[in-house]
Amino acid sequence: MTESVYVHIDTTSNAVLTKGLTATDFANSIVHFPQNLLLLDPSASAGEYESHTGLKVIRGTENIQRFFSSSRNRRGFDELKWIDFTDLTMLKELTPLEISELLYFGHMKTHLHSPFFYKLQNNFVYFDLNDQLNRIYYRYLDEFYRIFASKLSSILSDKINVKKSFFKKETPVEKISVELLKEMRNLMQE
């Protein structure tokens, strides 16, 4: 378990740069769970090939949950770079310019225009960066605050109960308020 969490929020693009929050933390705490993923790494081994974009997709929440849980074991081999989308037929409606924007986004890990595509109706864009950093674009920043509150509560619980004896009951830790973290937003910005 990580002992520290680094957070930087860019409210202009709803990008959150973090260290200490994992893909598992993300998957366990989000409310708007992705229906489908478009993997932005052209050499990704997971997923099925989608001919219109030339990228791989993972369809269905069960497959996505398996992908998230297997991503822990693959750490260091494949970079996690993906964007969620709602409808495969709308994915096939992307123009060549929109596909090139997605390719640029995946390669440079930054957006040219908005990180949220109308046709994809995406809520997230997820990038693993080096040194256990990740950048996630959230359509709804409340999703991030829920993940962050859950992670901080988990770290606190581990710290408080680290020297618990076999016979002693674990000390419960109240979940940190999302509203409190929202009030602290200015501390997480430049």
Residue positions per predicted region:
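Structured alpha/beta or helical-core interaction and ligand-binding surfaces enriched in interleaved
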Residues: 1-190
